[in-house]
Amino acid sequence: MNSFMIAFGLASIALCIGAFLRAKIPFLRNMLVPASVIAGLLGVIFMNAMSHFQINIGTDTEMYGNIVNHLFTISFISICLTGASDNKDNTAKNIFKGALGMGTVWCLLYTITPLVGMIIIALIGGGFNMETIYGSLIPYAFTQGPGQAAAYGTIYESYGWENAAMVGMTFAAIGFVMAFLVGVPAAKLGISRGVAKNCGKIDNSILKGYLKKEEQTNYMVKDTTCNSNMETLTFHFALIGLCYVFALGIAKVMSLLPGFLGSSMSGLMFMNGMYAAYIVKFIMKKLKIDFLIEDTLQSKITGWTADYLVVCAFMAVGFNIIGQWIVPIVVEALIVTAITFCVCFYFGRRFGGSNDFERTLGLYGTSTGTVPSGIALVRIVDPEFKTSTAVELGLMNLVMMLSTPVYIALLAMASKTISVQVTMAILAAMTVVYMIVLKVTRCWRKPTFSWKKD
């Protein structure tokens, strides 16, 4: 328990310092780097410095890895407990097309990146005693984020691949940096070239990352419980706890599935958490007590988990463990970043909508970090969310289910049920399938914007 609280406290200190540095350092303000990413970078340096000098601080990177796993499950439970958006400013047809196009390109990247990653590690990993299979961890980190990187890495470890979670979270940390290091200049270039049609002035409050008293607004967070009985916030955390225990039960049931599917599906706690949350919300609706869930408050809880998730994912990276592999990891991450950028900016221009530039930025941010990092990039060029892009980024999660054959193949490879060669053949075939889907659904059309200055 002491180890957990110390880890939580150190992450909190890092977040406070990150918020301060974001407000005071011009480069960080102009690049719109989130405080959580700044905190994570400081945290990973601190943790590894303490480890190098053998200073006992009462916690370690392993504890942060465990925290990431739990926070990720909690974040998905919270997302699923939150109600759907009522945005009606954009046509259903346009929203559907955007979600379908971005979701399919995401699936394409989910297939291409492990294929490229394994080829890279096969070519250069031998000199660093790094097995080819570790190259397949990058899609969990880039296209899904630190939570999935830790979750799937843990499953790989259960099959005998040591330090897979650490490798995955290292990829995720690099991905977050690349999301903003590349995405923000691309957004600013789009503004200067006249591509961003809905861009207003990025005000000082967004740059510095906090709101002064006169800039603050009141959010309509309603009390759904009587405070003398139970705080509304307490009730929402109690629901999350209920769903978490329910998810553990679902994991037990999943473990009864035959072969590698049982061990794999039971280990995907974030998915089990989703199932639990959907079932609990369904029951609450049937009992007509779903009014007790306050969506604005629930979304704030999700944001809380996301901030700590990013920080802890960075602080879970131990250079002393993956130090011998750092060169192939960085090389793979940089090459995959370049491929992700090219794929996003090629297909993003061809979805066939007036908000294709916003979609492109959101897709790139999501494909190197998480959906929140994608939305952060969209906000640069669409600060008032006049387009439907943010909604589409949420809805494309449904299209992401098309990636199921890919992660099943990767887990089968990790469990040694199928060979690396067979897996690579499956990935190559799925790449073709997703490209056909883009063409058939008319999400692969002529460019809708140009980088040439108007």
Residue spans for each PLM region:
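Juxtamembrane helix-boundary/capping and inter-helix hinge elements in multi-pass membrane proteins
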Residues: 30, 83-98, 125-132, 154-166, ...
